[in-house]
Swiss-Prot record:
One Gene Ontology cellular component: nuclear envelope
Gene it is expressed from: PAPP5
Binding site for Mn(2+) 1: 282, 284, 311
Binding site for Mn(2+) 2: 311, 343, 392, 467
Protein name in the entry: Serine/threonine-protein phosphatase 5
Source organism (scientific name): Arabidopsis thaliana (Mouse-ear cress)
Keywords linked to the UniProt accession: Cytoplasm, Endoplasmic reticulum, Hydrolase, Manganese, Membrane, Metal-binding, Nucleus, Protein phosphatase, Repeat, TPR repeat, Transmembrane, Transmembrane helix
Role played: Isoform 2 dephosphorylates phosphorylated phytochromes, with a preference toward Pfr forms, and enhances phytochrome-mediated photoresponses, probably by enhancing their stability and their binding affinity for light signal transducers such as NDPK2. Can use para-nitrophenylphosphate (pNPP) as substrate.
Length: 538
């Protein structure tokens, strides 16, 4: 028999759940989590509360926490299909398709007449089949050839069916062939074969002259050098939703590859006395917000350098425009822009969150492989003037890591699931001291004491990282020793957050934080190119 206090707790828990639901509807997912937590504290035997909190964690990309909460919902009520549903969705978002499939099969068993469950199960089955196929045909890493080394952008231009080879050149070739025939003497059939071969061969060679089609009206690179005028024209074309010729896209990516290949895994940046550098966080395919950053803070140049701290692509549907713009500035002047790898510069993320599909749609399949290769060359971290450590994710599961250890990382690979490289890309700060499990399910959470020891051990003053949405575009934590900066305002067109960037001026290197709001963009929704099964859960 329930007591009066127990009835009161259940009633108050329902009130908190209702408030949490309203916060969720308003895209205030952190507030929703806090309110669901209060409901759980009053009544932990309600599976709905756990499943709802799991959904809110999923919205914040905290998939590890979502899986924990959904598992708790299942523990409370093994017949509650939403628990399996929420856990399966979190597994999908992490790319753990086989685990997701098991959960959706259970959803189908519990709700056999639910058309939505049937549809999602089919999509998950397709994803698992595709994964098995890719595993079956994959080439071992040791046997893979560089995609970049198979591409010569100079030969990319006119196609044979649209050759612009001048007619007089073809006629000249025919005349020469006739003279040979007259001198040597051939039968009629042989003469025809010679003439046809000459004409077709002339046009075929013309098609590989490397000249860009005359009807192409977009930005052009003259020769080998990427200039500021070209980059400005290209950005204006992108702004107007025009495309860049594949020849120039190849040229930009291949030249960037050569620059990145020569860099160490940890790059030291020197900012002269009286000069500055701007650090930006995640931009996630939000090209029009990137243009706004340049409008507010100036274009990248040797006098106005930027460091973009990873997660250039995915989520937003203008990732191709973002990456070509950043790479073009790197080609134009390598010291005008520094680029760090984020957890989304990886095959596993790009398959799920839209970049791979967008590249396939806007460029070609070969570019998918090329970007995957070049992303492996991006540095993992930067140190500015020996004082500011900048990394996408965060710190490590062990103490005593030195900058020399980071420099020694062999980064030319897909991110592993554990170790220093994984933690640099995936870890997050936590308010409590020490270390804890990652709310994402990858990496770890680290406290202010961990930050303090790392900075002291390496004679550093500040840790700047990105990787997390913040309402104001930034957050200062760990007694002022850690700053999170996030530069994608109104993330995914729904979070309502501001964006931010940080300017550091030498010699004092004090952070000057600038915030900004989202700007309009064409009516292309985030995740427009993402896998269909993932879009169903967003």
């Amino acid at each position: 028999m329930e007591t009066k206090n127990e009835n009161s707790d259940v009633s108050r828990a329902e009130e908190f759940k209702s408030q949490a639901n309203e916060a969720f509807k308003g895209h205030k997912y952190s507030s929703a989590i806090d309110l669901y937590t209060k409901a759980i504290e009053l009544n932990s035997n309600n599976a709905v509360y756990w499943a709802n909190r799991a959904f809110a964690h999923t919205k914040l990309e905290e998939y590890g926490s979502a899986i924990q909460d959904a598992s708790k919902a299942i523990e409370v009520d093994s017949r509650y299909s939403k628990g399996y549903y929420r856990r399966g969705a979190a597994y999908l978002a992490m790319g753990k398709f086989k685990d997701a499939l098991k959960d959706f099969q259970q959803v189908k068993r519990l709700s056999p007449n639910d058309p939505d469950a049937t549809r999602k199960l089919k999509e998950c089955e397709k994803a698992v089949m595709k994964l098995k196929f890719e595993e079956a045909i994959s080439v071992p890493v040791s046997e893979r050839r560089s995609v970049a080394e198979s591409i010569d952008f100079h030969t990319i231009g006119n196609k044979p069916r649209s050759s612009s080879m001048p007619t007089k050149t073809a006629l000249a070739a025919v005349v020469a062939a006739v003279m040979v025939v007259a001198v040597r003497g051939f039968a009629t059939t042989e003469i025809l074969m010679v003439l046809v071969s000459v004409v077709l061969g002339t046009f075929w060679w013309g098609s590989f002259s490397g000249k860009v089609e005359p009807q192409y009206s977009g930005a052009r690179i003259e020769g080998e050098e990427v200039t500021l005028d070209f980059v400005k024209t290209m950005m204006e074309d992108f702004k107007n939703q025009k495309t860049l010729h594949k020849r120039y896209a190849y040229q930009i990516v291949l030249q960037t590859r050569q620059i990145l290949l020569a860099l160490p895994s940890l790059v030291d940046i020197s900012v002269p006395h009286g000069k500055h550098i701007t650090v930006c966080g995640d931009v996630h395919g939000q090209f029009y917000d990137l243009l706004n950053i340049f409008e507010l803070n100036g274009l990248p140049s040797e006098e106005n350098p930027y460091l973009f701290n990873g997660d250039f692509v995915d989520r937003g549907s203008f990732s191709v425009e973002i990456i070509l713009t950043l790479f073009a500035f790197k080609c134009m002047c390598p010291s005008s822009i520094y680029l760090a790898r984020g957890n989304h510069e990886s095959k596993s993320m790009n398959k799920i969150y839209g970049f791979e599909g967008e590249v396939r749609s806007k460029l070609s399949e070969k570019f998918v492989d090329l970007f995957a290769e070049v992303f492996c060359y991006l540095p993992l971290a930067h140190v500015i003037n020996g004082k500011v450590f900048v990394v996408h994710g965060g710190l490590f599961s062990v103490d005593g890591v030195k900058l020399s250890d980071i420099r020694a990382i062999d980064r030319f690979c897909e991110p592993p699931e554990e170790g220093l490289m994984c933690e640099l890309l995936w870890s997050d700060p936590q308010p409590l001291p020490g270390r804890g499990p990652s709310k994402r399910g990858v990496g770890l959470s680290f406290g202010g004491d961990v930050t303090k020891r790392f900075l002291q051990d390496n004679n550093l003053d500040l840790l700047v990282r990105s990787h997390e949405v913040k309402d104001e575009g930034y957050e200062v934590e760990h007694d002022g020793k850690l700053i999170t900066v996030f530069s994608a305002p109104n993330y995914c067109d729904q979070m309502g957050n501001k964006g931010a960037f940080i300017r550091f001026e030498a010699p004092d290197m004090k952070p000057n934080i600038v915030t900004f709001s989202a700007v309009p963009h064409p009516d292309v929704k985030p995740m427009a190119y993402a896998n269909n099964f993932l879009r169903m859960f967003n």
